[in-house]
Amino acid sequence: MAAPLALVLVVAVTVRAALFRSSLAEFISERVEVVSPLSSWKRVVEGLALLDLGVSPYSGAVFHETPLIIYLFHFLIDYAELVFMITDALTAIALYFAIQDFNKVVFKKQKLLLELDQYAPDVAELIRTPMEMRYIPLKVALYLLNPYTILSCVAKSTCAINNTLIAFFILTTIKGSVFLSAVFLALATYQSLYPVTLFAPGLLYLLQRQYIPVKVKSKAFWIFSWEYAMMYTGSLVVIVCLSFFLLSSWDFIPAVYGFILSVPDLTPNIGLFWYFFAEMFEHFSLFFVCVFQINVFFYTVPLAIKLKEHPIFFMFIQIAIISIFKSYPTVGDVALYMAFFPVWNHLYRFLRNIFVLTCIIIVCSLLFPVLWHLWIYAGSANSNFFYAITLTFNVGQILLISDYFYAFLRREYYLTHGLYLTAKDGTEAMLVLK
């Protein structure tokens, strides 16, 4: 599999290099679908200019990236294009090896359950085979050729760096490295705050890996959870303190995390926040900011309860929720959870609306620049048009993720109770998710 992966890497780098040298690079870097006030490369350049002048990059209201990012590019500004290409390649490689290991774990678990007769007798067609799972890691690595990923890289959106950190968190978690998992999760949280919700699936997987039961009365459960929480918190504290020593100031905390949570910049993007708060009376904004922000965090506990035996699927759902409900989303965020679709290709037969929802997402992606042009340049449309397509895009994503969630639970139920269900009167029964 090394040769196909190398081919994917070569093709991906070639496409990116060609686009970097084309006239499209400038156009892409200004697209509101691709960059946000948090991840815009132009804002990073302005922050670097202020730093070179001996002024805090957070003294204005323009730069909102983390201190480690600005110091990284302070030394690598001349190689920025190469940095972003390497970042994307590292993300794909990390996902490739993570899913390769995950498939081995899934197959071993499936084999054990078959030996213990935990599956119903008529579910042979639902059992996954090694041949079926062989090419899944390579399909995941095709993340590199996703148009969303390519656009994000060419625009030099710092979202790509956050994706890399999350990918390495997933890899180290699946490998069972408790310390590195905590470190990469801390880095991802430091970079964009919302990955803190990935703590729960990461912990659940590591508990599973250590054969520790997820039980409130289990002493081993609490000891391990405490150790992992301390590693994560300690890593985060060290990173934040390092940022303070670099800047000799705490200005970055309100400028980065306060900015993410309070959503003061209402520049249009593909998210749900900007239009709503642009139209709202100021004295209501704090309440509704809290209501909107809680969406990212609210689902973590019920999902942890429902999917405690399936932490990687939980992780996939949580990454999707972050990309939909975060305050400043871009297409780069969407690309990360889309990379996991091949992992769940065995759910395809249970998906109810996959064709319609795929069409909605593709059509919305094509209409974003059209409606933006009609609004901003032609003047023949207004913000309602652009927000309508944004809303449709996000509703499409929500329904798609809900469809995968339903399909996953349906397959798990069939594995235990049998594929062909019958009611008490002997007629064919229908499985309903409530």
Curated annotation (Swiss-Prot):
Please classify the protein's predominant subcellular localization into one broad category: endoplasmic reticulum
**What pathway is it annotated to?**
Glycolipid biosynthesis; glycosylphosphatidylinositol-anchor biosynthesis
Instruction: Give one Pfam family.
Output: PIG-U
Listed transmembrane segments: 4-22, 79-99, 137-157, 158-177, 178-193, 194-204, 222-243, 286-305, 311-330, 331-344, 354-371, 384-405
Q: Where in the cell is it found?
A: Endoplasmic reticulum membrane
Keywords (A to Z) from UniProt: Endoplasmic reticulum, GPI-anchor biosynthesis, Membrane, Transmembrane, Transmembrane helix
Swiss-Prot/TrEMBL GO biological process terms:
attachment of GPI anchor to protein; GPI anchor biosynthetic process
Residues binding a 2-acyl-6-[6-phosphoethanolamine-alpha-D-mannosyl-(1->2)-6-phosphoethanolamine-alpha-D-mannosyl-(1->6)-2-phosphoethanolamine-alpha-D-mannosyl-(1->4)-alpha-D-glucosaminyl]-1-(1-radyl,2-acyl-sn-glycero-3-phospho)-1D-myo-inositol are N382, N384
Annotated residues that bind a cardiolipin are located at: K215, K308
Which PANTHER family does UniProt cross-reference here? GPI TRANSAMIDASE COMPONENT PIG-U (PTHR13121), PHOSPHATIDYLINOSITOL GLYCAN ANCHOR BIOSYNTHESIS CLASS U PROTEIN (PTHR13121:SF0)
Task performed by this protein: Component of the glycosylphosphatidylinositol-anchor (GPI-anchor) transamidase (GPI-T) complex that catalyzes the formation of the linkage between a proprotein and a GPI-anchor and participates in GPI anchored protein biosynthesis. Binds the lipid portion of GPI-anchor. May act as an organizer in the transmembrane layer to recruit other subunits, and thus is essential for assembly of the complex.
* Name listed for the protein in its UniProt record: GPI-anchor transamidase component PIGU
Which gene is the coding source of this polypeptide chain?
Pigu
